[in-house]
């Protein structure tokens, strides 16, 4: 889906003033932990991430291609109804954290900001956000972590830990 949708949109994006493709996909991490018990889902998400790598190189300077991924679970119907019920939903962050992060990415210069794998709260902290409490009803240490966030490559910003 990601490849086909991008392929069909590229001719139109090339005519745009500041064209971007933003995939909601994780940083690539070959830790077997992410493959065990969820191989099909992992393959699907990492496929989207590989599209970021390939398309960012192929359209360098013409179309920005980046990936955004949440550090914690996000309040969606899937979380409430499929993954974890009301408790997991309540201990997830609000979708606004992703939209605020996406807004930052989509306003970057497409010629210079491409091929990045970004974690929502890290990006927001880098751009001056200090109040992460508005994105959740529980303290950070009680939130449900999301899948695919490598522990070593994307440390939690200090301002996030404190909120």
What are these regions (language model features)?
Residues 67-68, 86-163:
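C-terminal helical subdomain
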Residues 4, 57, 118:
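Short, flexible micro-motifs
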Residues 1, 5-9, 13, 51-52, ...:
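Hydrophobic positions on the long internal alpha-helix
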Residues 2, 20-24, 115:
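Conserved long hydrophobic alpha-helices within structured protein cores
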Residues 64:
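Conserved Rossmann-like nucleotide-binding pocket used by diverse enzymes
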Residues 10, 14-61, 69-74, 80-85:
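Catalytic loop of short-chain dehydrogenase/reductase
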Residues 3, 76-77:
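Alpha-helical elements of the RecA-like P-loop NTPase motor core of helicases
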Residues 1-2, 6, 44-45, 90-94:
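Short alpha-helix in the Rossmann-fold core of NAD(P)-dependent oxidoreductases
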């Amino acid at each position: 889906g990601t490849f086909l949708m991008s392929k069909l949109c590229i001719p139109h994006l090339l005519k745009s003033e500041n064209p971007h493709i933003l995939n909601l996909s994780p940083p690539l991490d070959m830790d077997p932990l992410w493959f065990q018990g969820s191989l099909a889902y992992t393959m699907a998400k990492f496929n989207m991430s590989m599209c970021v790598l390939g398309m960012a190189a192929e359209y360098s300077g013409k179309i920005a291609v980046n990936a955004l991924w949440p550090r914690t679970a996000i309040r969606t119907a899937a979380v409430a109804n499929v993954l974890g019920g009301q408790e997991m939903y309540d201990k997830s962050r609000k979708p606004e954290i992703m939209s605020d992060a996406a807004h930052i990415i989509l306003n970057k210069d497409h010629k210079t900001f491409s091929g990045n794998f970004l974690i929502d709260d890290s990006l927001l902290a880098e751009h001056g956000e200090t109040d992460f409490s508005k994105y959740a009803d529980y303290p950070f240490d009680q939130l449900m972590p999301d899948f695919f966030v490598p522990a070593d490559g994307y440390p939690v910003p200090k301002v996030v830990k404190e909120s």
